[in-house]
């Protein structure tokens, strides 16, 4: 993926017969996904005309040029990106975009390299980081909380892991 793109959401399914879609958003407020103009997915651009919030991080959206359920079905699972330069500047060192975490080093408190962040998920109850553990070549998923990840160094491209007791 292009480092200059940030994922704002994913189209999960069609909604109704007139071309509306359900979109899982990764924006601070779900309705904000319509504020950024054209969104990018592969070689295509999409403009969200309207949104209705139906839940935490879930909206029903209408997209320019999509007028039927069949057209909406073709958009299922498409990720919607925006150029990073179009996003607001982050002023606080504790602020970052989720995409900034991907490929970051995961270090233990001793500064020993433990693995790498491979993905950020949210299945509804909070953010989860998928970590590729170097020593085992296995992937684990951990809740992205301050207790488990007490320090994030965006400029240094690493995150500190306070390893939970249940992981050996």
Swiss-Prot record:
Primary role: An accessory protein needed during the final step in the assembly of 30S ribosomal subunit, possibly for assembly of the head region. Essential for efficient processing of 16S rRNA. May be needed both before and after RbfA during the maturation of 16S rRNA. It has affinity for free ribosomal 30S subunits but not for 70S ribosomes.
SUPFAM superfamilies linked to this entry: PRC-barrel domain, Translation proteins
Protein known as: Ribosome maturation factor RimM
Taxonomic lineage from the root: Bacteria, Pseudomonadati, Pseudomonadota, Alphaproteobacteria, Rickettsiales
Family according to the record: Belongs to the RimM family.
UniProt organism field: Wolbachia sp. subsp. Drosophila simulans (strain wRi)
Principal location: cytoplasm
Matches recorded under InterPro entries: PRC-brl_dom (IPR027275), PRC_barrel-like_sf (IPR011033), RimM (IPR011961), RimM_N (IPR002676), RimM_N_sf (IPR036976), Transl_B-barrel_sf (IPR009000)
Biological processes, Gene Ontology terms: ribosomal small subunit biogenesis; rRNA processing
NCBIfam families: 16S_RimM (TIGR02273), PRK14592.1 (NF011186)
A single cellular component GO annotation: ribosome
GO molecular function, one term: ribosome binding
Subunit note: Binds ribosomal protein uS19.
PRC barrel domain mapped to chain residues: 92-167
């Amino acid at each position: 993926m292009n480092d200059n793109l940030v994922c704002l959401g994913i189209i999960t399914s069609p909604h109704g017969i007139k071309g509306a879609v359900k979109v899982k958003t990764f924006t601070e407020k779900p309705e904000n996904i319509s504020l950024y103009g054209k969104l990018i997915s592969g070689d295509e651009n999409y403009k969200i005309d309207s949104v209705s919030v139906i839940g935490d991080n879930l909206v029903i959206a209408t997209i320019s040029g999509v007028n039927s359920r069949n057209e909406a079905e073709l958009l299922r699972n498409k990720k919607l990106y925006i150029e990073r330069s179009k996003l607001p500047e982050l002023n606080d060192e504790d602020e970052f975009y989720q995409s900034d975490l991907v490929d970051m080093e995961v270090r233990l408190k001793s500064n020993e390299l433990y693995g790498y962040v491979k993905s950020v998920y949210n299945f509804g109850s909070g953010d989860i980081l998928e970590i590729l553990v170097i020593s085992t070549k296995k992937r684990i998923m951990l809740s992205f909380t301050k207790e488990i990840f007490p320090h994030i160094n965006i400029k240094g491209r690493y995150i500190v892991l306070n390893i939970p007791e249940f992981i050996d």
